[in-house]
Amino acid sequence: MSFTVAIVGRPNVGKSTLFNRLVGKKLALVDDTPGVTRDRRPGDAKLVDLKFRIIDTAGLEQSAPDSLQGRMWAQTEQAIDEADLSLFVIDAKAGLTPADETLAEMLRRRGKPVIVVANKSEARGSDGGFYDAFTLGLGEPCPISAEHGQGMLDLRDAIVAALGEERAFPPREDVAETDVDIRPAGAGGGEDEESEPAYDKTKPLRVAIVGRPNAGKSTLINRFLGEDRLLTGPEAGITRDSISVEWEWRGRTIKMFDTAGMRRKAKVQEKLEKLSVADALRAIRFAETVVIIFDATIPFEKQDLQIVDLVLREGRAAVLAFNKWDLVEDWQAVLADLREKTERLLPQARGIRAVPISGHTGYGLDRLMQAIIETDKVWNRRISTARLNRWLESQQVQHPPPAVSGRRLKLKYMTQVKARPPGFMISCTRPEAVPESYVRYLINGLRNDFDMPGVPIRVHFRAADNPFESKARKRR
C-alpha cells in the first residue's frame, strides 16, 4: 500500500460506514448505537485509482486515561500517529459539537494533513453543518454520503491534493521474473501420484482466538505482538469487532483474529451483541486453526464445551489454551484434573492439544504456537489410497462390520476425498445401514493409527458399484 489513512471523529458520525465503503466489504460492525467501534481496525482501501491502507477508529470522547473511553482515545491517537493523513468525519446533519472542536484542536497539534469529511450531506438541513465546518480551521470540508456512496470522487481529489501526486501515486516496483514450472498437472517427474504432499511451511496461517467474555483473548494477542494493540481491561465484553493482526513466528506469517466473547445464546439479547457474535462466527469460518481460550480458574463451563463443539462442527482445527495460569496455585493437581476432564468431556476431539498459558506473563506462549502449527499440519494431512485400503482391511480383520438384518456389511474400498479437515469416502454394501458405533470405531482408528489428534474427521459411505448392473438392464 502506498500510504495510510486514519478515519477519526466523535461517536456515531459514520466512520465505520465510510470504512466499509472504502474497503468494499462490510468488515466493520455498523449500528445506530454510539461507540460500536472500540479497537482500531486496518483494511486495504480502493478509491477510484487510489490504493491505500486505512484504519477505522473508535469515536473520540475525552475521559480519564484509565477508563475504557480513555483507553479507546489512546488507541485512536496511535492510529493518527501511524497514518500519513486523517479523515476527520463530522455529521453535517447534526452540525458541529464541542467534541468536534476538541478533536480539531488535537489534530491541528499533530501537524499532519487532515481532510474534514462532512458525512450525511445528502440529508435535508445538512448545509448548515457543512458551512460550520469551515470554522474548524482545517481547510475546505468535503461533503459525502458514506451510506449512499456520494462524493467519493471529490474525496479522492481531496486526498491527492493533501498528499501530493508523488505520494498518492508512488512508482510501481518492477517484479523480477521467476522460473515458472510449465509442466502439465500430474507431470511430477516420475513421482508416484499417490505420494503424500509435504506440509507447506511458508503459507500464512489464519488463527482465530475465541472463548467466553473476559477469558483473556485480547491480552493474549497483545502478548504475542509485544504491544498494546488491542483494548483490554477488567470490563467483560470490551471486544466487539473481529480484529485481525499479522505478525511472524519463527519466519511464519500468522494472521490472528481477536473475537468478541461468546455467551450462552439465551443471554444474548441486544442487537449489537448478536452482531458481534455473528462476526466471531465469520472469523471461525475464515480461520484454519481456532484457539479456544478457557479460564483456568473456572474451566469447562457449559459454554466452553459448546464453543468447542461449534468449532469442530465447522470443521476447524482446534487447540485449547488454559489461560490465567499465573493465578493457579496447586498447578500439578489442576493440570492433571484438566487433562482428565478434557478426555472425558470432549470425546469428539480425542487427543486435542491443550496448553496452560498466561497472557499476562507470557508463560506457555511458545508451546501454544507449536501446538497450533502441529494441529494445522494434521488438519492439512493427506493419506495415500494404498495405505488407507491396507488399513481398512486390517480394521475389518480386527473388528468385522456387524450383520444388519441378518446380512453382513462389506467395506470394499477407501480413499481420502479432501483435507482441511480430513474427509474419507468408503465404498460398501448398504451404506445407509452402517451403525453409528462402527463409524466411531473407524474414526478412532484413523485418529490413532495415522496420528490425527484433535481435528474433526469426516467419514462418508457410498454404495459400491455393481459391475453386473448394466448387463441386467440390457436383459430387461
UniProtKB/Swiss-Prot annotation:
Keywords: GTP-binding, Nucleotide-binding, Repeat, Ribosome biogenesis. Residues 381-465 form the KH-like domain. It holds the Pfam family MMR_HSR1. InterPro entries: G_ENGA, GTP-bd, GTPase_Der, KH_dom-like, KH_dom-like_a/b, P-loop_NTPase, Small_GTP-bd. GO terms for biological process: ribosome biogenesis. It comes from the Bacteria. Residues 3-167, 205-380 form the EngA-type G domain. Residues 178-199 are annotated as: Disordered. GTP 2 binds at residues 211-218, 258-262, 323-326. GO terms for molecular function: GTP binding. PROSITE patterns: G_ENGA. The keyword Nucleotide-binding applies. GTPase that plays an essential role in the late steps of ribosome biogenesis. Belongs to the TRAFAC class TrmE-Era-EngA-EngB-Septin-like GTPase superfamily. EngA (Der) GTPase family. This is GTPase Der. It comes from Sinorhizobium fredii (strain NBRC 101917 / NGR234). The lineage of its organism: Bacteria, Pseudomonadati, Pseudomonadota, Alphaproteobacteria, Hyphomicrobiales. The gene is der.
